[in-house]
């Protein structure tokens, strides 16, 4: 249990430093772009209608 607590502490520290720098904004923008790309691919595949 102590090992897991230390791992989560390290992950929380890394996430905190990335959140307070400027990396979080860039990661959010990349996530939005990827969401739109995969949403477009979903719509195209649904409209294509070919079953595999």
From Swiss-Prot:
Membrane topology per the record?
Answer: Multi-pass membrane protein
Give the transmembrane region(s).
4-24, 29-49
Q: Which UniProt keywords apply?
A: Cell membrane, Membrane, Transmembrane, Transmembrane helix
InterPro entries linked to this entry = DUF1328
GO annotations of cellular component type = plasma membrane
Tell where it localizes: Cell membrane
Query: Which HAMAP family does the record match to this protein?
Result: UPF0391 (MF_01361)
The family assignment reads: Belongs to the UPF0391 family.
- Name of this protein: UPF0391 membrane protein Tgr7_2500
The protein's organism comes out as Thioalkalivibrio sulfidiphilus (strain HL-EbGR7)
